[in-house]
Amino acid sequence: MRAKISSQAAVAIFLALVTCCLGTVIKGLGVSGVFEDTLVVFEKVETEDVGARLVFLGDQRPKNPYGGTVRVLFQPGESGTCSIPLLQVRYSNCTNTSAAVFSGCYRTDTEFSVPRANRGTSPGFVSLRTPTMLDSGDIYVTVHLDHLPRPDAFRIKFVSLYTGNETVRISTKDRAGRDRDSYGGASSPVGGRDSNRRTASRNDDGDLPLALYGPCRPCGKNCKNLREYLLTEESWHEWTSVFAPTTVAPTTTVATTAMRSTTVSFATMTAEVITSTGTVSMEPHNTTTADMVNLTAADPPPSEPVPALNALAIGLVVGGTVASLVFLSVILGGLISCCARRRSARRLLTRSNSAREMEDLAPSSEDARTSRMSPDVVELSELVNGAPLSHRNDIGGDDLTSISSASG
């Protein structure tokens, strides 16, 4: 007896195989994510793609053209009280209904990003430039399809062991005079100028950690279960204003080192850059959310592969149609000429058969022709001519006159 495998068992086996080969597989409402639970970088890298591979499993694949948005959030490893927006990419009019999500889209727009977080090589990934230890934390990838009521979210733990070369000490103060760490968490009141200072690593390009490029949005009671919170429609609408396009933050040069101004809402920040030449202090200054960085204008124009593919497809269809017509015309011409030749050969064969039949029917000698004449005519011809009649044409006008006078 042959055992039958149900569809659910087949899907479970497939997911088990994919999990063993590629990592964790989570099936969401609209899309599924394939990713590694923990991604570790042991040394310096130019860029590192972090995220989840987005796929359609089972009945998730849409039957009509669709669109959607991908958002990437960063929760610093040293602070579990807030999260920072890194990237937002919008995909429109995706007509290719393959297993890969957002493939064959007519338009792809990077609506929001920070200087060190760009769009990855595939949807669902963010490309981090030269990540350091302070870029370690949790990366959340949220995906919202336009035709679905709520988004899907996936969590990837990212760890970088690269320390960087330069060091930055940063402390912040809120209006109450309390120190706030660079990730937005409040600590005890300030005891002195150097108290409760944090040490951050700068990479070779002089860039600050990801946590210092945008305001860390407090998540309150939702921080412990941030992924479950990001699965709600409420969270998607709350983050919409945070991911709105903003202006590019100005840069300040200190001791020949370019340092981007950080963004901490309603806070006063004091920074010291420790270099080989000594310590340079910066005066406290107020920053607003206008310092958030949006690289939409700096991004290269989004690629639109589908129109190009459509033009190529149209060219192939037209060329194939013309070639088919030429091929059919050649075949039809050959058939017509073949039929004409066969018809001509049939006519010639019919004529030759008719001529052969006539020859067979024609008498072979004079005696045979004479034997076919009427006996009376033969007798009269013999009486007049005195000799046997050889042909009908032998009877002339004089013979007829003689016959008539003799009979008279």
UniProtKB/Swiss-Prot annotation:
<feature type="compositionally biased region" description="Basic and acidic residues">
    <location>
        <begin position="194"/>
        <end position="205"/>
    </location>
</feature>
<feature type="topological domain" description="Virion surface">
    <location>
        <begin position="24"/>
        <end position="311"/>
    </location>
</feature>
<keyword id="KW-1032">Host cell membrane</keyword>
<dbReference type="GO" id="GO:0044156">
    <property type="term" value="C:host cell junction"/>
</dbReference>
<feature type="glycosylation site" description="N-linked (GlcNAc...) asparagine; by host">
    <location>
        <position position="93"/>
    </location>
</feature>
<dbReference type="InterPro" id="IPR002874">
    <property type="entry name" value="Herpes_gI"/>
</dbReference>
<dbReference type="GO" id="GO:0016020">
    <property type="term" value="C:membrane"/>
</dbReference>
<feature type="region of interest" description="Disordered">
    <location>
        <begin position="172"/>
        <end position="207"/>
    </location>
</feature>
<comment type="similarity">
    <text>Belongs to the alphaherpesvirinae glycoprotein I family.</text>
</comment>
<keyword id="KW-0472">Membrane</keyword>
<keyword id="KW-1043">Host membrane</keyword>
<protein>
    <recommendedName>
        <fullName>Envelope glycoprotein I</fullName>
    </recommendedName>
</protein>
<dbReference type="GO" id="GO:0044178">
    <property type="term" value="C:host cell Golgi membrane"/>
</dbReference>
<feature type="glycosylation site" description="N-linked (GlcNAc...) asparagine; by host">
    <location>
        <position position="294"/>
    </location>
</feature>
<keyword id="KW-0946">Virion</keyword>
<dbReference type="GO" id="GO:0055036">
    <property type="term" value="C:virion membrane"/>
</dbReference>
<keyword id="KW-0261">Viral envelope protein</keyword>
<feature type="glycosylation site" description="N-linked (GlcNAc...) asparagine; by host">
    <location>
        <position position="165"/>
    </location>
</feature>
<keyword id="KW-1133">Transmembrane helix</keyword>
<comment type="function">
    <text>In epithelial cells, the heterodimer gE/gI is required for the cell-to-cell spread of the virus, by sorting nascent virions to cell junctions. Once the virus reaches the cell junctions, virus particles can spread to adjacent cells extremely rapidly through interactions with cellular receptors that accumulate at these junctions. Implicated in basolateral spread in polarized cells. In neuronal cells, gE/gI is essential for the anterograde spread of the infection throughout the host nervous system.</text>
</comment>
<dbReference type="Pfam" id="PF01688">
    <property type="entry name" value="Herpes_gI"/>
</dbReference>
<keyword id="KW-0732">Signal</keyword>
<keyword id="KW-0812">Transmembrane</keyword>
<feature type="region of interest" description="Disordered">
    <location>
        <begin position="357"/>
        <end position="376"/>
    </location>
</feature>
<feature type="signal peptide">
    <location>
        <begin position="1"/>
        <end position="23"/>
    </location>
</feature>
<feature type="compositionally biased region" description="Basic and acidic residues">
    <location>
        <begin position="172"/>
        <end position="182"/>
    </location>
</feature>
<feature type="glycosylation site" description="N-linked (GlcNAc...) asparagine; by host">
    <location>
        <position position="286"/>
    </location>
</feature>
<comment type="subunit">
    <text>Interacts with gE.</text>
</comment>
<feature type="topological domain" description="Intravirion">
    <location>
        <begin position="333"/>
        <end position="408"/>
    </location>
</feature>
<keyword id="KW-1040">Host Golgi apparatus</keyword>
<keyword id="KW-1031">Host cell junction</keyword>
<keyword id="KW-0597">Phosphoprotein</keyword>
<feature type="transmembrane region" description="Helical">
    <location>
        <begin position="312"/>
        <end position="332"/>
    </location>
</feature>
<dbReference type="GO" id="GO:0043657">
    <property type="term" value="C:host cell"/>
</dbReference>
<keyword id="KW-0325">Glycoprotein</keyword>
<dbReference type="GO" id="GO:0019031">
    <property type="term" value="C:viral envelope"/>
</dbReference>
<feature type="region of interest" description="Disordered">
    <location>
        <begin position="388"/>
        <end position="408"/>
    </location>
</feature>
<feature type="glycosylation site" description="N-linked (GlcNAc...) asparagine; by host">
    <location>
        <position position="96"/>
    </location>
</feature>
